[in-house]
Amino acid sequence: MFDLTGKNVCYVADCGGIALETCKVLMTKNIAKLAILHSVENPQAIAQLQSLKPSTQIFFWTYDVTMARADMQKYFDEVMVQMDYIDVLIYGATLCDETDIDGTINTNLTGMMNTCATVLPHMDKKKDGSGGLILNVTSVIGLDPSPVFCAYSASKFGVIGFTRSLADPLYYTQNGVAVMAVCCGPTKVFVDRELTAFLPYGQSFADRLRTAPCQSTAVCGQNIVRAIERGENGQIWIADKGGLELVKLQSYWHMADVFLHYMQDKEDD
């Protein structure tokens, strides 16, 4: 169980849709500080959030998830002046544009990895932080493939692979930072807009998705926070159809068994 009371939360996402609803729930958890990082500011949404809990400090910084790692490091050095420390990092920036493969990969995957790598030293209990939690908000088509949104699905599969890798005890026992992911099912904010399939053969299916049943952003946001509070390091959750379900992870190639000797410390030999 993870208690959000008094925690400093950094949320990388737009201040609308699922992110806004998640932040609304976070504001009911007596968090100390909330930082929202995105390329476009939404003053109305931030004012709405502040009205929910005036005692919680809210910050907004303009943030480009595609910036170079060196620039990110300078950026977060400035963020930390106001935040002091980060207990929870939530990465929810996402792009589904099958006509822009580079943008989709850079936003959903590369930007997430660079952000995590940049923020981790500020959370690492052996460095500048006291441990904490990283939550990657991803998609159910990062678990099962999508013949319609191939690039988007590939980027989300990458998020799952990175999350599970970073959650390995090799890191967690040292830095004290748990890493999890929540895979959101079809949500209203996603299907309400025009969608383009990777290949023309899938376009009729993409068009029909706009009328498919989907969960509300409010319910999805509630379940994202539930996953934070209930989850443990390495877990992957599905937030779909108004519910929250833990994914039963399976290993097909047991790396530790095959390379155990090479993965041991020299002192263990």
Swiss-Prot record:
Q: Which residues form the active site?
A: 152
User: What keywords tag this UniProt record?
Assistant: Oxidoreductase
Keyword Oxidoreductase included in the entry's annotation = yes
Q: What's a Pfam family this protein contains? A: adh_short
Classification via CDD domains? ADH_SDR_c_like
Residues the record lists as binding NAD(+): 11-34
Give GO MF terms, alphabetically: oxidoreductase activity
Q: Which residues bind substrate?
A: 139
Highest rank taxon of the organism: Eukaryota
What are the record's GO terms for cellular component? cytoplasm
Entry similarity comment: Belongs to the short-chain dehydrogenases/reductases (SDR) family.
Q: What is this protein called?
A: Alcohol dehydrogenase-related 31 kDa protein
Highest lineage ranks of the organism? Eukaryota, Metazoa, Ecdysozoa, Arthropoda, Hexapoda
What's the encoding gene here? Adhr
